Amino acid sequence: MAVIKSALELALERTKNLQVDESLQKASEAKLEGRKAASRWLEEPESVDFKALAGAIPPEHRQTFLRAAFEVLSTQVQLPLNTGIDKAKLEAAGKAIIVLCGLSSRFGSEREAKLAQQQVQSLFQQILQFLGQYSEEMKRAEQAIRNQWAPKLKEKERQLAAQLGQNVRIDPMSDPEFAEFYRKNIDAMRKNYANALEEAKNQLAALCGFATNE
């Protein structure tokens, strides 16, 4: 025999669902505010007070706010597409991450938070050095690839010159064989650096209590 729920039971279930929905909405709002705050910081750091903004978020959603801000800032920490890095923007992101770390609910005391901030600052400096090293290594690798390919390219130019009866210059990147060789070597190098950088960013998140599994 089917159990017929009372009006009170049904009302309580609806209330429970409403409470869950409201909690999810508050969490979503906290995440959005965190992202907006981090974006503003990158444009105009002096206009953002993370401590005050976090204080305005309900305590149960404060960590969501901080994690969302951290995620936006950490996207600035990436391998440059060209050989240069935007050091000023990276340093601004690092400064904000240190502030966010100090506000994390992971720490039971101010002393613990300060220690974590020091560790984050040290790790971020290592990341900056790593990115600078990457830029230099990419320049050297590109030059080494061009030097290695130069004899083949000169031979192709010589053959074309003999056919056309005039001197010929070939842009290395317009040569499919060279382009494939270049891409394969540069992509492999970039992948190694990208993996190492991702690991360092995960360490940053873990130090602050912003890892996705926390």
Regions found by a protein language model. Give the residues of each.
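Intrinsic-disorder-associated interaction segments
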Residues: 1-4, 27-31, 43, 58-59, ...
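Generic alpha-helix signal with a bias toward terminal, lower-confidence helices
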Residues: 16, 20-27, 53, 77, ...
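Long amphipathic alpha-helical segments with strong coiled-coil/leucine-zipper propensity
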Residues: 38-142
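Intrinsically disordered or highly flexible coil/loop and linker segments, enriched in small
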Residues: 21-24, 43, 47, 136, ...
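Alpha-helical context
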Residues: 6, 14-17, 29, 106-110, ...
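Leu/Val/Ala/Ile-rich N-terminal alpha-helices, chiefly Sec-type signal peptides and the beginnings
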Residues: 1-63
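Long amphipathic all-alpha helical oligomerization modules
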Residues: 143-214
